[in-house]
Amino acid sequence: TLIIGWLWWLLAGYNEIEAHILGEHHFSVLIVFFTLSVAALALLSAKIQWTQLARVGFWLLPLTCVLAMSNFGEALFIGYDVYPSQGWGLLALLAFVLVQYRFLWRQREISSCGLLSAFHVLTAWFLFSLVYWEASHWQRELQWYGTNAAILWFACLVVPLVALLSLTNKSIWPFAQYSADYKNLIPAPLLLGLLLWFIAACHYSGITDQFYLPILNPLDLAQAAVLIIFAYTVKRGFIKLDS
């Protein structure tokens, strides 16, 4: 009965949004709809002491992922100008992040550790994918190619990786409780992407429209930074590179 009611609510809300909201706002409005629905049920669950109701929160990530993949597919294959920060997208995604991690925190002593571990990994990977979707949009919009594009993708890969390197040794949730996930699984696509970036960057000269200085130009400095980051990840035992 709970699942039937939840599915009915989602379908009714989706139809209302499709009927009354402009197409360019569908992505952000649907995320807000999913997020507020989960947040409201979580509050109701605590109010009436019905823990099973709060487990509807496990739907938030899959729903948002399906929505994002659908919109990304439309942007990629149909040519619609859709990207995460469009309209109220950033505020909607901020609400999603807050509710998602609040839900995972509240479930830490209720649900199985394996299930929560998987959701931490998948949530982080989903957030990474949104960053790369956003970056690919602005790369096309600003027509950045060659060295400019290489620096853009360097930043997209390095910033979250450096954040993980600085946070995984903190004794705070969720990094302390799920240290294996945040050191092994979550950074894996970042490190793989950075390795591929380094290989691709070796084929660029580093010359830009600005003043060019051999060795001390942005691309060469970025490549040096990658080597330092890889050395530090080995030292910190990320994805068990120190074994």
Range-by-range predicted roles:
Residues 1-243:
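Alpha-helical transmembrane segments of multi-pass membrane proteins
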